[in-house]
């Protein structure tokens, strides 16, 4: 199994993993896989929002001349 061929046949890959001793209790069922994916996406979104807030807080307030240019 290499980076190029690993997704060609997922069943073959799974069988090879089992054959070399992969623990079956580490295999996620569909509901656990979906829940894990959802948690990952929620964490990404939370980090994105935190980074946006951090960026906005670090921005200096425009001075009076800059406000005039904006208006």
Swiss-Prot record:
It comes from Eleutherodactylus coqui (Puerto Rican coqui). PANTHER family: NUCLEAR HORMONE RECEPTOR (PTHR24082), THYROID HORMONE RECEPTOR ALPHA (PTHR24082:SF42). Coiled coil: none annotated. The keyword RNA-binding does not apply. Nuclear hormone receptor that can act as a repressor or activator of transcription. High affinity receptor for thyroid hormones, including triiodothyronine and thyroxine. Keywords: DNA-binding, Metal-binding, Nucleus, Receptor, Transcription, Transcription regulation, Zinc, Zinc-finger. Residues 48-71 are annotated as: Disordered. GO terms for biological process: cell differentiation; negative regulation of transcription by RNA polymerase II; positive regulation of transcription by RNA polymerase II; retinoic acid receptor signaling pathway; thyroid hormone receptor signaling pathway. Belongs to the nuclear hormone receptor family. NR1 subfamily. Composed of three domains: a modulating N-terminal domain, a DNA-binding domain and a C-terminal ligand-binding domain. One of its GO terms (cellular component) is RNA polymerase II transcription regulator complex. Residues 1-22 bind DNA. This is Thyroid hormone receptor alpha. InterPro entries: Nuclear_hormone_rcpt_NR1 (IPR050234), ThyrH_rcpt (IPR001728), Znf_hrmn_rcpt (IPR001628), Znf_NHR/GATA (IPR013088). One of its GO terms (molecular function) is zinc ion binding. A zinc finger (NR C4-type) spans 1-17.
């Amino acid at each position: 199994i290499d980076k190029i061929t690993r997704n060609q046949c997922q069943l073959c890959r799974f069988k090879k993993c089992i054959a070399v001793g992969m623990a079956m209790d580490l295999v996620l069922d569909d509901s656990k896989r979906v829940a894990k994916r959802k948690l990952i996406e929620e964490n990404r979104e939370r980090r994105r929002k935190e980074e946006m807030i951090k960026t906005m807080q670090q921005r200096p307030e425009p001075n009076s001349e800059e406000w005039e240019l904006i208006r």
